[in-house]
From Swiss-Prot:
Protein family membership: Belongs to the enoyl-CoA hydratase/isomerase family.
Pathway: Lipid metabolism; fatty acid beta-oxidation
Binding-site residues, substrate: S69, G70, I71, D72, L73, G128
Protein name as catalogued: Delta(3,5)-Delta(2,4)-dienoyl-CoA isomerase, peroxisomal
Gene Ontology CC terms: peroxisome
Subcellular localization(s) per the UniProt record: Peroxisome
Length: 278
C-alpha cells in the first residue's frame, strides 16, 4: 500500500518486516507547531494507517529538536481574524465553534484509530502537544522532555482535549494545578504524575526502547490488542457494571477466533505465535 505524502507529517516504516509504523510531526523549522494543515492531514494519516493491514502499532513522534511546541501562532491568529471579520456576531461565533470542533475531532482521531498509538516525546511538549499525547494510548519520553499546558498564558481555555483527558491520567487536582499555572514540568515529574510510563536517558534510547515495546505489542493477536484498546476507552466513560457488560458482548463476538487457537497452540509448543493481519 502506497503511503500518501503530507505537508506537516511523515509516515515511515523503518523495517519492511515490521508492522510498526512511525507517524512523525514534520515541521522542525517551526518546532513542530500545529498548523491548520496539520489538523486536516493528521486524521487522514491516522485513518490511512488504521485501514492498512500491514500496520499493528503506530508510534507518534516529532522531527528535529522537539516533539511539539503547541499550536502555530499564525494559524491561531488566522482563526481569530476569520471569526471576528463578520458583522453578525452569532454567525461568527458559530463559525468559530465549528472550527474548534473540527480541530478537536483531529485529536480524537487517535482514540478512534483501532491500532494502538504510542507517543514518543522528546524536547518540548507544549499546549497542543499535550492535547495530542493525552489522547494517545501509551506515552514515553526522553530525559530532556518538558511539558506545559500553556493555553492560559495565551488567554485561552485549552479546548482540544487536555482538560477532558488529563484528569483521568494524573488526577483532578494535579490537572487543575498544571492547567492554571501553565508551569513547565520535567519528564521525571511527568513520570511521577503518571503522564508517561517511562523516561529514557536520551532520544536514541527513547526511539529504540519505544520501538522494542511497539514490536512486542505488534506480535500479539491484533484482535486482542484492538479489543483491549476499545474496551479500555469504553470503560473510561461507563460504570464498572456497564464496562463488564460491554466486554462480555465484545468477547462473545471476538473470542472464538483463529487467534485464540493459535495463541494456545504456541504456548503449548513453546513457539512464537503467528497471527493473520487485521
Amino acid at each position: 500500500m502506497t503511503m500518501e505524502s503530507y505537508k506537516t507529517l511523515e509516515i515511515i516504516r523503518k523495517n519492511t518486516d515490521s508492522s510498526v509504523f512511525h507517524l512523525i510531526i514534520n515541521r522542525p523549522s517551526h518546532l513542530n507547531a500545529l498548523s491548520l494543515d496539520f489538523f486536516i492531514e493528521f486524521p487522514k494519516a491516522l485513518s490511512s494507517l488504521d485501514q492498512n493491514p500491514d500496520v499493528s502499532v503506530i508510534i507518534l513522534s516529532g522531527a528535529g529538536k522537539h516533539f511539539c511546541s503547541g499550536i502555530d501562532l499564525n494559524s491561531l491568529s488566522s482563526i481569530s481574524t476569520q471569526s471576528s471579520s463578520g458583522n453578525d456576531r452569532g454567525r461568527s461565533s458559530e463559525q468559530l465553534r465549528r472550527k474548534i470542533k473540527s480541530m478537536q475531532a483531529a485529536i480524537t482521531a487517535i482514540e478512534q484509530c483501532r491500532k494502538p498509538v504510542i507517543a514518543a516525546i522528546h524536547g518540548a511538549c507544549i499546549g497542543g502537544g499535550v492535547d495530542l499525547i493525552t489522547a494517545c494510548d501509551i506515552r514515553y519520553c526522553s530525559e530532556d522532555a518538558f511539558f506545559s499546558i500553556k493555553e492560559v498564558d495565551l488567554a485561552i481555555v485549552a479546548d482540544l482535549g487536555t482538560l477532558q483527558r488529563l484528569p483521568s491520567i494524573v488526577g483532578y487536582a494535579n490537572a487543575m494545578e498544571l492547567a492554571l499555572t501553565a508551569r513547565r514540568f520535567s519528564g521525571s515529574e511527568a513520570k511521577d504524575l503518571g503522564l508517561v510510563s517511562k523516561v529514557f536517558g536520551s532520544k536514541s534510547e527513547l526511539d529504540n526502547g519505544v520501538t522494542t515495546i511497539a514490536e512486542g505489542i505488534g506480535g500479539k493477536s491484533p484482535l486482542a490488542v484492538t479489543g483491549t484498546k476499545a474496551v479500555l476507552l469504553r470503560s473510561r466513560e461507563v460504570s464498572v457494571e456497564q464496562g463488564l457488560d460491554y466486554v462480555a458482548t465484545w468477547n462473545s463476538a471476538m473470542l472464538i477466533s483463529d487467534d485464540l487457537n493459535e495463541a494456545v497452540s504456541a504456548q503449548m509448543m513453546k513457539r512464537k505465535p503467528r497471527f493473520a493481519k487485521l
